[in-house]
């Protein structure tokens, strides 16, 4: 009837689940009107992280959500005071430009300049976030440039960078090359923090932090930077708790793969960088992981529409606090990357050994899947045995006779690569298979360098390969899947598939990254009619889940569960 409804009393009445409210003229207004359904849904979302004792409040992490309330209200006193901040935070593409100081001795690309502005913008508002650019797009340089730009505002508190041990050298090298004015100190052992003098940036490893967490927790830090942040994706681990306990003005996570297996890993990162953005992990599982990954929906609700709604709500909340650019979007001048799957047929003797093991392990596993949580270790041990048998029987039985068809395929492929004057990175998850690869390459007269977790002089072997001493670099997936710049190679060979595609993508991006001037060829060696075929299909489902949440796909998938494992064991 044209009467104006004040927003704040309406907001409070809906939040308190009232069916009607009294207007200024004494008349009652029904709150069951369909026009209020959208507002009621938004309040249900906001109540998860708001307090109502002193009136409606919304954390500054929910400003994108607050903009939805603004859309529904004609007037809101609270919205007036929050409008300027909400306008900027709800669309991070409009962040004010930060001028990269002359002390940064690098020419940043436009997307990198925007990354610097985004980091500085969130820091000014004391909001953390996730820089989720594709691997190889220069996340380290963007952070260093942002630290240089905000150096005068640090207030004497150094930034703390936590990274895998293998990546610490990269921070040292890039800071010395690009921001030499920044005073960078490396803490490489327990007790080392006490010896740090005046520094702008302190760099340490996750291992040192875990062993010396009390000393780090006692300090007050400016920026906290988590490089390769997937290291803290499990909230049940000691390292996650140690990182969460650190006192910092603002926290940023760097990872091209902010989750690899499940959305709960994304929640674990955001609980550090943006605490309060989402409800508890339990509710996050119920409200997002269940519908999006596993298709769990309430009764009498159309499943597809409900999953899409939950996915869009997740995207909307995450979008202001995550910046992700892919190579296809911002590095059009990067040489192309081609991929080819090479199917390897097992020899008759190898096939006989594999099939016998498959029948035995299949019967064992299928009987355990009804209680996967309790039997997970046994199940994955059996799956790992089948994966190793797909490579070579000798990985399980050193006395086994017969050669490995995959090793034969590797040698043949490398001979062709070397004849063309190219150089190759060869990855395997199993160091024992790298041992067999060494023997095969030695017999073929192919020179190689090797890097795995036991390598003492990591920088030395990397430098030797970069210097051109050998045409082949054998690398374990865990030791060399991140933190290396190996653009000297333009061929990548993946000897065995891993459960999730993110780990393999990180390995490929050792060669296909900024600085590469030649097309990169990726070969995936898959043993035909083995568990490797099934693992490859599982990878594709996980890639769809990643794309559905972080990229603009409308696809849905599930994490690894009992049904996935049954699929791995199908004939």
What spans do the regions from the language model cover?
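ASCE P-loop NTPase motor core, strongest for the SF2 helicase catalytic module
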Residues: 75-300, 305-307, 313-571
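Charged, low-complexity intrinsically disordered regions
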Residues: 1-88, 156, 266
């Amino acid at each position: 009837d044209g009467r104006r409804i004040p927003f704040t009393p309406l907001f409070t009445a809906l939040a308190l689940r009232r069916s009607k409210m009294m207007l200024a003229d004494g008349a009652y207004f029904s709150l069951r009107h369909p026009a209020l359904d959208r507002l009621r849904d938004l309040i249900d979302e906001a109540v998860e992280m708001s307090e109502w004792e002193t009136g409606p409040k919304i954390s500054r992490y929910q400003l994108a959500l607050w903009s939805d309330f603004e859309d529904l209200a004609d007037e809101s006193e609270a919205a007036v005071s929050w409008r300027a901040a909400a306008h900027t935070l709800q669309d991070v593409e409009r962040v004010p430009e930060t001028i990269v100081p002359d002390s940064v001795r690098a020419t940043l690309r436009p997307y990198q300049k925007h990354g610097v502005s985004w980091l500085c913008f969130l820091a000014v508002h004391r909001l953390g976030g996730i820089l989720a650019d594709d691997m190889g797009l220069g996340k380290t340089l963007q952070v260093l440039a942002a630290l240089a730009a905000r150096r005068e505002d640090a207030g004497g508190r150094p930034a703390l960078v936590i990274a895998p041990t293998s990546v610490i050298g990269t921070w040292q090298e890039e800071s010395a090359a690009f921001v030499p004015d920044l005073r960078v100190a490396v803490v490489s052992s327990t007790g080392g923090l006490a010896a740090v003098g005046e520094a702008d940036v302190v760099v340490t490893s996750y291992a040192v932090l875990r062993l010396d967490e009390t000393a780090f927790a006692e300090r007050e830090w400016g920026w906290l930077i988590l490089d390769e942040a997937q290291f803290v994706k499990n909230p049940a681990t000691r390292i996650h708790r140690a990182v969460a306990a650190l006192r910092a003005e603002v926290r940023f996570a760097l990872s091209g793969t902010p989750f690899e297996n499940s959305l709960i890993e994304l929640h674990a990162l955001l609980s550090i960088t943006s605490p309060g953005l989402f409800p508890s992990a339990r509710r996050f599982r119920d409200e997002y992981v269940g519908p999006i990954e596993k298709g769990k929906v309430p009764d009498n609700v159309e499943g597809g529409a409900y999953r899409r709604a939950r996915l869009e709500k997740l995207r909307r909340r995450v979008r202001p606090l995550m910046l992700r650019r892919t190579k296809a979007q911002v590095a059009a001048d990067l040489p192309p990357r081609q991929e080819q799957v090479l199917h390897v047929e097992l020899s008759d003797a190898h096939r006989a050994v594999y099939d016998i093991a498959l029948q035995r392990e299949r019967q064992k596993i299928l009987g355990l899947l009804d209680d996967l949580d309790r039997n997970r270790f046994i199940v994955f041990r059996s799956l790992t045995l089948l994966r190793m048998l797909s490579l070579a029987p000798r990985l399980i039985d050193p006395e086994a006779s017969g050669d490995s068809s995959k090793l034969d395929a590797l040698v043949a492929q490398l001979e062709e690569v070397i004849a063309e004057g190219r150089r190759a990175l060869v990855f395997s998850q199993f160091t024992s298979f790298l041992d067999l690869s060494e023997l095969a390459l030695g017999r073929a007269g192919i020179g190689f360098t090797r890097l795995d977790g036991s390598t003492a002089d990591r920088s030395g072997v990397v430098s030797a390969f970069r210097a051109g001493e050998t045409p082949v670099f054998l690398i374990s997936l865990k030791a060399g899947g991140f933190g290396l710049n190996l653009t000297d190679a333009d061929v990548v060979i993946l000897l065995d598939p891993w459960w999730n595609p993110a780990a393999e993508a990180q390995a490929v991006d050792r060669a296909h990254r900024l600085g590469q001037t030649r097309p990169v060829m990726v070969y995936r060696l898959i043993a035909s009619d083995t568990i490797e075929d099934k693992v490859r299909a599982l990878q594709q489902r996980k890639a769809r889940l990643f794309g559905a949440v972080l990229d603009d796909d409308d696809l849905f998938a599930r994490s690894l569960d009992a049904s996935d494992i049954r699929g791995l064991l199908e004939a």
